[in-house]
Amino acid sequence: MNQAKKLYLETFGCQMNVSDSEKIVTLMKGMGYQQTQDPVDADLVLLNTCSIRATAEQRVYGHLGKFKSIKKTKPGLIIGVGGCVAQQEGEKLLKKAPFVNLVFGTHNLHLLQGMVAAAEEGKRSSQTDFLDDEKRFDLFPHSEAEGGVTRFVTVMQGCDNFCAYCIVPHVRGREISRSAAKVVEEVRALADSGVTEVTLLGQNVNSYCSKQPGEPDFPDLLRLVAQVDGIERIRFTTSHPKDMSPRLIECFADLPKLAPHIHLPAQSGSDRVLERMNRGYTAQQYLAKVAALKEACPAIQFTGDMIVGFPGEDEAAFQDTMALMEQVQYADLFSFIYSARPGTKAAEYADDATRAEKQGRLERLQAAQKKTTLARNRSLEGTVQKVLVEGLSSTGDSLFGRTGGNRGTVMAGDPSLAGRVLDVKIVEGLQTLLKGEIVHD
């Protein structure tokens, strides 16, 4: 009896990459590969990479060095690199890392099976061509990942915003939206398989179908998905503040299934920096959207992104960012030191702050956010939250789920409760999660 081939897959970066990795698992399963959590056991190692910051690229090359060592003792090991670093580097990656067998870009998952088959025959290859818009979703494979009650559903790909610091339009391509009918069809199929929560994915979901007049826009799509029986909760990410329309804000008031949480990246609180970033809004316009969302849904929780040390940011601009954070009161915040990316407008800007200054600002920002996050979590103590149970916690001795506001919560209970939305009384708010008790009738 032939032993099943083993796949080790490592994913870096955003939720779109996580979604793409689910598709990769499905494709490789079709070739007889089963997943393993140990690269030493693998016959095929694939990295799905991120290039949003230089540190992400450096991590990829660091990991490749680890797999190179494994390949020395296992010459038949196939190593492949996909995602945004692969899209950016292309064949150069094969030259930099001659032990890599294949490189596949963000538009080339439909070619992956053929590339792996060629690698099994000893052939190296690189595929990073962008697909035409009309072909992109027709050729892009779908995930058939098994298990779990939450799932990502891609509704659009690419980005047309060209923020000065961002490489996404260069490695993911221009915006293209999937038809509403196809999205709803996938959501129905997921609901039939036991999924109870879907997250609608795109680099900028707010501009869904903006280039396709006559098609449902994103608020319309949310209302269509909310009609699918079996789906208890809907999330979406990521949102661009400039495209947060009144009709989309109304959805938070009108749709009980829409989770009271939004990831709304500000990136800076300084109007001067926001203009240099080409974000398309001022700090006051951003705060007006936040206020409108809070009015529509008083329980809404905000998460976001902030960049510190962007060219032109001085101490006054940084203090503007701190002031915006204080007004919004983010439940959580992803924050980073600016990293110049090749081909972007900001790469041409003079870098006018020292590394020590940038690091100091980041540490001050993160310390302030840490206090806010803990305070917000503690403010939930004694309240009853709607928690969608996802399954066992990482320790295996309790259940794990998320509140509507996207706060991770652990509680005692039977694993059969996975997929249910339960009333949970929060007994303790910690830095990174909540502890709760299921409220029984």
UniProtKB/Swiss-Prot annotation:
UniProt domain TRAM: residue ranges: 378-440
Residues binding [4Fe-4S] cluster 2: 159, 163, 166
Domain Radical SAM core: 145-375
Catalytic activity, reaction form: N(6)-dimethylallyladenosine(37) in tRNA + (sulfur carrier)-SH + AH2 + 2 S-adenosyl-L-methionine = 2-methylsulfanyl-N(6)-dimethylallyladenosine(37) in tRNA + (sulfur carrier)-H + 5'-deoxyadenosine + L-methionine + A + S-adenosyl-L-homocysteine + 2 H(+)
Entry-linked SMART domains: Elp3
Binding residues for [4Fe-4S] cluster 1: 14, 50, 84
Compartmental location: Cytoplasm
Gene Ontology terms: cellular component: cytosol
InterPro entries per the UniProt record, alphabetical: Elp3/MiaA/NifB-like_rSAM, Methylthiotransferase, Methylthiotransferase_CS, Methylthiotransferase_N, Methylthiotransferase_N_sf, MiaB_methiolase, rSAM, rSAM_horseshoe
UniProt entry tagged with the keyword Transferase: yes
GO molecular function: 4 iron, 4 sulfur cluster binding; metal ion binding; N6-isopentenyladenosine methylthiotransferase activity
Family annotation (Pfam families): Radical_SAM (PF04055), TRAM (PF01938), UPF0004 (PF00919)
Cofactor(s) demanded: [4Fe-4S] cluster
Documented EC number(s): 2.8.4.3
Note describing how the cofactor binds: Binds 2 [4Fe-4S] clusters. One cluster is coordinated with 3 cysteines and an exchangeable S-adenosyl-L-methionine.
Keyword DNA damage: no
Organism domain of life: Bacteria
CDD domains per the UniProt record, alphabetical: Radical_SAM
Domain MTTase N-terminal stretches: 5-121
Protein keywords: 4Fe-4S, Cytoplasm, Iron, Iron-sulfur, Metal-binding, S-adenosyl-L-methionine, Transferase, tRNA processing
Entry similarity comment: Belongs to the methylthiotransferase family. MiaB subfamily.
Subunit field text: Monomer.
Protein function: Catalyzes the methylthiolation of N6-(dimethylallyl)adenosine (i(6)A), leading to the formation of 2-methylthio-N6-(dimethylallyl)adenosine (ms(2)i(6)A) at position 37 in tRNAs that read codons beginning with uridine.
Name of the protein in its database record: tRNA-2-methylthio-N(6)-dimethylallyladenosine synthase
Organism for this UniProt entry: Citrifermentans bemidjiense (strain ATCC BAA-1014 / DSM 16622 / JCM 12645 / Bem)
